[in-house]
Amino acid sequence: MQRFIKWLAVITSLDLLIVLLGGALVTKTGSGQGCGKSWPLCNGEFVPSNLSMETIIELSHRLTSGSAGILVTLLCILSWKYYKHVRETKTLAILSFVFLVAQALMGAAAVVWGQMPAVLAIHFGISLISFASVILLTCLIFEIDQKFDARSLIMDKKMKFHIYGVTIYSYIVVYTGALVRHERASLACPDFPLCSKNRPMPTQLHEWVQMGHRVAAMLIFAWILYAMILAIRHYKQQPVVYWGWIISFILVTLQAVVGVLVVFTNASLAMALLHSLFISCLFAVLCYLVMLGTRSKVNAKEAELTSKQTK
């Protein structure tokens, strides 16, 4: 059964990643109304008779979201049953399921009633939490923490501050990026790093949305760079923290490069999807570090108790 659960966890993680990228594809191609205003049917039909490209993209996104719902539900039930001895299992299972349902309902509401771009931008963030929760469940199932000896990990308050702070802030950056997509502001500023050669400062809403995201992205790049330097200096003996921050910096660098290329490639589809891919992976890595940070407090108490007993 454990072998089956491992395969299920991997397939579910991949399916949720496809759902995330599919949502970005729907937004990028303007396929949100590919099935009209009907849900769960497509243009009022179970199998649509008129298959335009927008309909195919929207319908594919709905099908992958539906399969993700089934897989996440099954994974939550099995992990709850067979891995309940691991402290975070139940919390992650609940988060995975609840946020997936919230994402599906919000997507359906956007189709039927329509939503403001500021509200639609939350849709990607909700999906991201479900994805990260499933990734963490997968890590627990594969016992990644044991391989990195994470059970004995103890972090100082400074490192935990950076882990929690960067993760929360990354969610804000994700929201600003999603807002750029839904406001159709990807090409509002044709230059980089300033908005335009003729107008370095933004003058209208779409330019402010674009430049706000750029500033937020630059700040998270600098913050992760600083945290990585701390990890390299002080956590070489803790490989999970050491490599966690190095991987985070690699991902945020790739994210930044692709973000610039989105501007200079006229918002090409490939760059837009890579932009969503890298931030999804980065958020999952940061959430894993958060989980380790919560364990660190427990590990410190256990170490202190053991020390008192030996005395």
Swiss-Prot record:
It is a multi-pass membrane protein. InterPro entries: COX15/CtaA_fam (IPR003780), COX15/CtaA_HemeA_synthase (IPR050450), HemeA_Synthase_type1 (IPR023755). The gene is ctaA. The lineage of its organism: Bacteria, Bacillati, Bacillota, Bacilli, Bacillales. Pathway: Porphyrin-containing compound metabolism; heme A biosynthesis; heme A from heme O: step 1/1. It is found in: Cell membrane. The active site is at E58. Disulfide bonds join C35-C42, C189-C195. Heme o binds at H61, H123. Residues 1-6, 84-91, 143-159, 233-243, 293-311 are cytoplasmic. The keyword Iron applies. It comes from the Bacteria. This is Heme A synthase. One of its GO terms (cellular component) is plasma membrane. Keywords: Cell membrane, Disulfide bond, Heme biosynthesis, Iron, Membrane, Metal-binding, Oxidoreductase, Transmembrane, Transmembrane helix. Belongs to the COX15/CtaA family. Type 1 subfamily. Its cofactor is heme b. The chain crosses the membrane at residues 7-27, 63-83, 92-112, 122-142, 160-180, 212-232, 244-264, 272-292. Interacts with CtaB. It catalyses: Fe(II)-heme o + 2 A + H2O = Fe(II)-heme a + 2 AH2. Its EC number is 1.17.99.9. Heme b binds at H213, H275. GO terms for molecular function: metal ion binding; oxidoreductase activity, acting on NAD(P)H, heme protein as acceptor. Residues 28-62, 113-121, 181-211, 265-271 are extracellular. PANTHER family: HEME A SYNTHASE. The N-half (TM1-TM4) and C-half (TM5-TM8) domains are connected by an intracellular loop. Each domain is formed from four-helix bundles and they align in a pseudo twofold symmetry manner. The N-half domain is the substrate-heme O binding domain and the C-half domain is the cofactor heme B binding domain.
